[in-house]
Amino acid sequence: MDVESKISLILRYPTEEVITVEELRELLQLGHQLNHYIGFEISGFIHIGTGIVSMSKVVDLQRAGVRTQILLADIHSWLNNKLGGDLDTIRKVAVTYYIEAFKKVIETLGGDPDATRFVLGSDLYHHNDEYWLLLMDITRHLTLSQVRHSLTILGRKMGESIPLAYLVYPPLQVADVFALGAHIPHGGVDQRRAHILARQVADKIRFYPLEVGGKRVKPVALHHKLLPALNISTKPSNKEELSEMKMSKSVPQSAIFIHDSPEEIRQKISKAYCPPRETEYNPVLELLHISAFREERKTPFIIKRPPQYGGDIEVWTYEEVERLYREGKIHPADLKNATAEALINILEPIYKYFQGPGAKLLQEMKNITITR
């Protein structure tokens, strides 16, 4: 695969931005093995924003010849008091439910689960003096203002009452980029600030310098779209506000989980925010895009409509759907029905896995979340 084809794969939906495309091109042109990483907190059930959206980019990167890595961020999760702040439980969930779920999603999306390296954060840090020297080195080159700016909206609003752990978190994220040798750190657009910090210190750190062919380089940040919560009631005014209105594990009706049954998916989508003719920040359209139009279609996609309203519509591209919806030629109810069936189809192998071989993992997770 030539460089431009690799770039097209990396840039395609659901990619939101790459910082910068030209630097990515330069790295690919050098012809050396590039490494990627994406990190996840260990908390509740995996929803499709974490599962389908994130893993679709992992699969794209695999196809582009990039070595992919998933960091199971147990220490970060503990700092953020996930799963009740029980570190043993966090670690158990990470190496069981999370790894197996991600592997199944990667396989379902056409990738190779064995080609992705899974790293538990505490394993990366254990008996690793150089990691802690790296972390201290990073803090030498960051100001309190920079770290505060990298926090979530909520964290920035807390002022002087903010837990110190929240301020430790961004430097840890930056250190992970270099400790994993990640030329392409990846996350949702809500991770942009942390990745910018990594780029700012890349030329200054002494430990774990990021190199390609002996040349020191800055990490090229890859950010994918965030799925709006199904139950939003208004359109977010900007991307940062969207990060506070994204699908959330802690609000079940805001999200579709990778193990949800067809009935649950239909029910959730039927109640989703989907204003007529509105195509921006429309969660139903975003779900249809990721489930039915990420790959070039070999057959038309059918949106069923009652005969009295013109009958079924055949479309080949997402752009067609968006245009027809904006023009009012697709009713929200018909869009929701078509989206639900498309999502049920793509999630079917994952749903069957959690009904069969993965049923024990799912039940263990349910037991854990009930007691937290």
From Swiss-Prot:
One of its GO terms (molecular function) is ATP binding. It is an enzyme of class 6 (ligase). InterPro entries: aa-tRNA-synth_Ic (IPR002305), Rossmann-like_a/b/a_fold (IPR014729), Tyr-tRNA-ligase_4 (IPR023678), Tyr-tRNA-ligase_arc/euk-type (IPR023617), Tyr-tRNA_synthase (IPR050489). Keywords: Aminoacyl-tRNA synthetase, ATP-binding, Cytoplasm, Ligase, Nucleotide-binding, Protein biosynthesis. It catalyses: tRNA(Tyr) + L-tyrosine + ATP = L-tyrosyl-tRNA(Tyr) + AMP + diphosphate + H(+). It holds the Pfam family tRNA-synt_1b. HAMAP family: Tyr_tRNA_synth_type4. Homodimer. This is Tyrosine--tRNA ligase 1. It comes from Pyrobaculum aerophilum (strain ATCC 51768 / DSM 7523 / JCM 9630 / CIP 104966 / NBRC 100827 / IM2).
